[in-house]
Amino acid sequence: MAVSSKSKTGRSPKPAKVQPSKKVESRKREHEEESSDSSESDNEKLVEELDDDFDEVAELLGDDIKDPEAKKDKKKEKKIQEEERTRELTKPTAESNHDDIVTDNFEEAGLSEPTLKAIKDMGFSKMTQVQAKTIPPLLAGRDVLGAAKTGSGKTLAFLIPAIEMLYSLRFKPRNGTGVVVVSPTRELALQIFGVARELMAHHSQTFGIVIGGANRRQEAEKLMKGVNLLIATPGRLLDHLQNTQGFVFKNVKALVIDEADRILEIGFEEEMKQIIKILPNEDRQSMLFSATQTTKVEDLARISLRPGPLYINVASESEASTVAGLEQGYVVCESDKRFLLLFSFLKRNVKKKIIVFLSSCNCVKYFGELLNYIDLPVLDLHGKQKQQKRTNTFFEFCNATQGILICTDVAARGLDIPAVDWIIQFDPPDDPRDYIHRVGRTARGTAGKGKSLMFLTPSELGFLRYLKAANVPLNEYEFPTNKIANVQSQLTKLIKGNYWLHQSAKDGYRSYLQAYASHHLKTVYQIDKLDLVKVAKSFGFDVPPKVNITIGASGKSIEKKHKKQKRA
């Protein structure tokens, strides 16, 4: 299924199209283009069951208990008791630690010959820590709630037991789907699909993928033929479960929820609840992996896992949150020098494989067009692109030995892109968790090495306190000013003289400010402290352009500051 495409470096980029929308809906559409109707929650079902129980008790005790207020209080009390009992039942009964590891050798794990042959073909012999702690209990049929660092080998940890189960049960296409893997993004789903294809090279079982943006009819045809191992994004999976005739899922024996916190973060909580209700739960093994254990993740674990799951956490609180082979640093840079420093860095590292993270789709679009226009070839990846474009870009960069990818956080979670040398956080991350996931695109695997560089303005240095609290070690890097290419005048002249680039720069500038104003860490990222003249220069403007920013009170402060700076 590998796809490739040539990088386009055309001289006349088209104007950017701005499609304003509400924040939550925008983030959700970035990962799925279809939506699904909401259905009643588990709580409503529970209330119905409690009603039945109450009526039975009322018949036994007489009319005195049938007072409406008494009935309401009784239902509320029983509902609370039931939820507490359910939480207690699904509370992990044990936590795996390093002593639980029996072997770190795949050949000693009791795997089938077809799986061992595939693992050998992939070049693996030893398990990572998360694999050694997860695979044996999953092979034994336990439910697992896992927390692991990015780049720890989690994908193999859940795919190997799933494939072994299909093999041992001798699944055939006519049996339909036996394992469902749910992933938050299309790119991550494609990556898991690629790993599954390698692992199942010597197995007879079938595998497939359903994701938003792909051809739904072709997906339905494959499902009707029988897909034993199915990788999916939430919205498209729910669509097929509800609407595809001939999709056999009554034999599902295992459910894997990968990056559960991210799935919930981008707005798929209701879809996941519906998926779990639709899939058969009798004797179903479940595996849930999440980088963070939020209340919503705990609720999802409660309804998806059987009582007493095994909790696996491969990192203690005292350990660094990022992998050992990663060299991390930051540079303090005024806003007007940010692009000049980035341009100089990329020019000096054209033989490296680099990922640059930006805060918005329009910023990625503008800087992609600009860099390609000035003959610094880059690929770009963001949520407003069509799925085929995103897929082509992803695989092209994966297969490249050198090159530059500029992207939004759509590429920050879970993606296993080989041999990335540098991670550049040109626009700062929202919080330490996002920082960790971004840098996790390099130094992957047991012996992986890589470097990361984060750009900070002087007013953003407070973010370092949060990283220190999260056990993230950083060093300050310094770049001599005489080593930075001073191309500001050429940049300004180019933006003035090219209508399409000017419009794209304006859209990028607007979306940068809006993204900045929406940061969660308001004490660090204070939009009132931004020097808009300097910010505008980084986009190629002499003076800040007039832009409409729909962020309420923050938008007003921007306009006032804009006018004040113009008078100065």
Swiss-Prot record:
Localisation: Nucleus, Nucleolus
Sequence motif: DEAD box, positions: 258-261
Sequence positions that bind ATP: A148, K149, T150, G151, S152, G153, K154, T155
Gene Ontology CC terms, in alphabetical order: nuclear envelope; nucleolus; preribosome, large subunit precursor; small-subunit processome
Residue span of motif Q motif: 104-132
Known catalytic reactions: ATP + H2O = ADP + phosphate + H(+)
Location of the Helicase C-terminal domain: 325-495
Residue ranges, compositional bias (Acidic residues): 49-62
Gene3D superfamilies associated with the record: P-loop containing nucleotide triphosphate hydrolases
SUPFAM superfamilies named in the record: P-loop containing nucleoside triphosphate hydrolases (SSF52540)
Motif placement: Bipartite nuclear localization signal: 337-353
Domain called Helicase ATP-binding: residue spans: 135-311
Subunit comment: Associates in the nucleolus with the 60S and pre-60S ribosomal subunits.
Family: Belongs to the DEAD box helicase family. DDX18/HAS1 subfamily.
Protein known as: ATP-dependent RNA helicase HAS1
Organism in which the protein naturally occurs: Debaryomyces hansenii (strain ATCC 36239 / CBS 767 / BCRC 21394 / JCM 1990 / NBRC 0083 / IGC 2968) (Yeast)
Gene assigned in the entry: HAS1
